[in-house]
Amino acid sequence: MKNKIEELPIEVKPLEGYLLYIKFKNNEEKIYDMKEMLKFDYYKNLRNKENFKKVKVYGITLKWSTGEDIAPEKIYFNSIPLNDYKFEIKEMN
């Protein structure tokens, strides 16, 4: 397992299709697909694109203005390296 400090997000951008672009402290860039998470009631406010777009790096994790957050290990270990992502990536409008 990598050092947790390397797994910390330092930048996040919401993308079309409820994806997140995340850059980590170790300079890895990854894509995290939030669609499965949106099925849970905890994340129901993020089904609204305007709410989803309001994601920020907050301390060691990602957090939305509506209060939801997600563990850094979850996004790190369940995301796809940017270079391996085979689909079109568009910033969310």
Where are these regions (language model features)?
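Motif-centric detector for short Cys/His coordination patterns
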Residues: 1-93
